[in-house]
Amino acid sequence: MEKHAFDPACCLGERLQTLSRAELTALAETICRILTERGTYHGGIRPDNISRAEDGTVGLGAPARTDTKDWTTEELEFMAPEVFWSGSLDASADVYSLGLLLYAGVMGGRLPFYPDDRAPQPEDMAAALRRRM
């Protein structure tokens, strides 16, 4: 298996919100190290595209698809605006997505502009996504 390859059996997904701040920090550091080692931009940093084994081993899934507009909701939720609007993939897109990942981890899975007083409904999530884009 390729070093830092994504392992679907260890998909981070909703487990993101169970990580401690120390674990979130270690996860972010590892993701940055992986991207630096690869020497490329990813554009697809999101919970369902990260694997984290019990021993802390981290893997990244496929990079962002910039040649399509047929994205999943999860892809859109963590996508940088410049990737959405122009397909522009650079370090700032990865910083943006990593920042959202950390925000969601600290905030119990909530993303910016979700309502504070209740669980977000689909229309709340769509409105929040529009504000972030």
Give names to the regions the model predicted:
Residues 17-32:
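Conserved short alpha-helix within the protein kinase catalytic core
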Residues 83-91:
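Conserved end of the kinase activation segment
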Residues 94:
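Conserved catalytic-loop aspartate of Hanks-type protein kinases
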Residues 1-10:
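Conserved short submotifs of the Hanks-type protein kinase catalytic core
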Residues 105-106:
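Hydrophobic anchor on a C-lobe helix of Hanks-type protein kinase catalytic domains
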Residues 35-52:
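Catalytic-loop of the protein kinase fold
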Residues 70-82:
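Conserved activation segment of eukaryotic-like protein kinases, specifically the C-terminal portion
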